[in-house]
Each structure stands twice: as C-alpha cells, then as structure tokens.
Amino acid sequence: MNINAAPQILGRSSQDITPGYMSGFGNSFETEALPGALPVGRNSPQRCAYGLYAEQLSGSPFTAPRGANERSWLYRIRPSVKHSGRFAKTDMGLWRSAPCFEHDLPIAQLRWDPPPMPQEKLTFLQGVRTMTTAGDVNTQAGMATHLYLITQSMVDQHFYNADGEMMFVPQQGSLRLVTEFGIITIEPAEIAVIPRGIKFRVELVDGPARGYLCENYGGAFTLPERGPIGANCLANSRDFLTPVAAYEDKDTPTELYVKWGGSLYVTKLPHSPIDVVAWHGNYAPYKYDLRTYSPVGAIGFDHPDPSIFTVLTSPSETPGTANIDFVIFPERWMVADNTFRPPWYHMNIMSEFMGLIYGVYDAKPQGFVPGGASLHNMMLPHGPDREAFDHASNGELKPVKLTGTMAFMFETRYPQRVTEYAASSGLLQDDYADCWNGLEKRFDPNRP
C-alpha cells in the first residue's frame, strides 16, 4: 500500500510552528485543516463553519480539578454517533485483559526471546500478543503489556480503546498512526501515546514492524515531579509533539473495532471516521523521542534508584505509588567512584516488565536481546548476572559512556500475571535463572 497516496488533508497550528506537530506536554492546543474551521470565543456555535458538527471528547470527569481536567472539542464531518452502528462481539485473537488467569506456571523470574516476524499477513489488531496483565480493566486500575507483530497496514479498518490509553514502543520498523486528531509517525527509540476513546488505524512505513505496547487502564500518563532536581532534565515538555489536524472526506465502507470491558466489538460504517477538520483542547495523542531524554545520575558515588529514569507516570490514588511508571535506560555516563555501577541486587514491592529496543543492557549482557523481554514480579529477587558482577567488581573505575543502548521498563504496583501465550509460545527461556548460578560464596570472616 502506498501510504503517501492516502487522501488526508493536513492542517496547521494557529502559530504555524513545527509543520505536522505542535510542541508541548498537556498544552491546550488548537489546530485546523481548513481556515476558519475553529470557532472563536466559543465551543459550540449554533452553526459550525463548513457544515461541521461540534463534539466534545472528555478524558476526565467534568468536575475533575482544573490541573487534571482533560477534554478536547472536535469539529468533524459527522458526529461520532454516526460511527456506532450495531456492534457485534468478535474474536480477540491473542489480546487479553486483566484479570486474566490462564496458566499454572510457578512464580519465577522470567525472560523471553524476541518473537520471529511471522510470514502471514497480520494487521495491528491481528498482531497483538498479550504477555502480562495486572489489576482489573473494569475498575480502571492496572495495565497490560503486549508485543505487536505487524506485516500489513490496516485498510478500511479503524479502532479505538475504551479500556485504556495505549503506549506504542517500536523496536523494529516504523509506524504511521492515522488518528482523528492528526497523523503521528514513529520509529524505534520513539514512543506514541493514544488516549482512550480516540479512533485510529495503524499503517506500516518501511516494512514489517515489531514492538511493545503498554495498555494503561488507570490514570493518564503524565510527567513525574522533578522535586529537588528542579525545572530541567529528564523528559522536557517541549520535546513532546502533538499532531496538527488532518482529515479524510472518504465515503467508502470501513470497519470500526472497539475494545470495551475486555472484549472486542466491530461495526460497519459507510465512511471513514477520520473526519475531524479542526480541534482544540488538551486531550490528544502525542509522540516523544526517547533520545531527547536528559538523564540525571550519581556524579560522586553509589547507584541511584531506577525511578530517576522515569519518563512518564500513571499515578494511583496512593501518593508516590504508581499505577505504571515508564522508565528508560538510555545512553549515559557512568562515573561513580568506589561504586558497584550496574543496578544492584534487589527485591521490590513493584512488578517490573522490561524490554530492549536496541543495544546491550548493562546488568544483563547475555540473554536479554533486542525485541525480547523479562519479568521480575513483586518480591522476587533479581539483579546482575555473574558476568556483569565480575566485570563491575573488578573493572577499572574510569568514566565510561554507555552508548548504543535503549532499554525500558513498565513498572506497576500490581502483580503481573503471565498469559498463556507468554507461557507456551516457545519464547520463554527455561534457563534464565541459571544466569545467577555462577555467583559463589565470597564471604571470608578473616579478610575484611
């Protein structure tokens, strides 16, 4: 499919800055694909320009505090009630939602090889493989982690997720996310977040694609507090990009899929739902380049907690306890003196799902490869393998720059339950726990 031939009409921001995208996190944006499509000084005029319909999309209750209130006004060719015919329940494939109890694996530290790219034709919806679920989709708490394998673009198919917002983390191949708010293109080392309720389709850009997907049932991702770090570093607001308006006036049959309550439903439409000509508000999809993250670390001694690398957080009702933290381990300098520099041995109240986009992870130089994954559930010990321990314990402590690496972690307060696919797909490494077998007793009471 030639994606460049699709009949989208691109818009612009009112400031005409950064063609294709508007800069900022959580801003109140405004953008129009036709001049004058946005009403001035009001949200729902008696008659909208160009014969459009005004529609509000709310991502929070009306009475949420102003700082947490999320909504956008859309000016579209048809209202969304015309996008919802008679829905029929349809097969979910390998997509699962919490709570999900499918296997009888004993508790353990787990690690998976990357899945091979399939030969059959798989769209995004067909290519989702759920690895873990946590919490409960019906109480809007918790998350699910998925892999995606895509070998063909969605054509005359669209989707929205009522259960949660979705974070795409490409590992191989680029994606073009055609949303009703505009068009987002992402490549490995970039992420995109599509809030719940926003319609989109997934297209391939440069061949088959593989990556990770976090489905957030809880509070929307937001930037973490910096505390004494101050006003700069970590993920800076200006580096987040939201698309300008783009629309299709396309009267061809299409299917609309909706994930709702852990099930998948489908309806048929006689037209494309990507028909928003203009919009304004702060509830919108966005992208972020992980390579713009400015890491902060120890410049004297000791290894800081991994929370120092948080990009985005989904807060829970308990202050300081995340529904999800999205954490990365990017290129950085290691300079701490008289210090064991890799991540230390650890038991944690949080449950950690890790993936590797490219390069080598410093605590696991073997076995944890790009496209693979690991799971260290709550209160299960983990840490460097024998090779990493020996190297870090005996190596010269000169400044070292970790280059060509990008690992990440989805960390949640809830136990992550492994799906049947994750347990029996053949990707699970049976010998993962053996990586610690070489750690010998080193204690000698006669040698301090």
UniProtKB/Swiss-Prot annotation:
One Pfam family of this chain: HgmA_C
Binding site for Fe cation: H346, E352, H382
Keyword Metal-binding: yes
Active site: H303
CDD domains: cupin_HGO_N
Enzyme Commission no: 1.13.11.5
GO molecular function ontology, one term from the record: iron ion binding
Required cofactor names: Fe cation
Cystine residue pairs: none
Binding site for homogentisate: Y361, H382
Role this protein plays: Involved in the catabolism of homogentisate (2,5-dihydroxyphenylacetate or 2,5-OH-PhAc), a central intermediate in the degradation of phenylalanine and tyrosine. Catalyzes the oxidative ring cleavage of the aromatic ring of homogentisate to yield maleylacetoacetate.
Protein name: Homogentisate 1,2-dioxygenase
Gene: hmgA
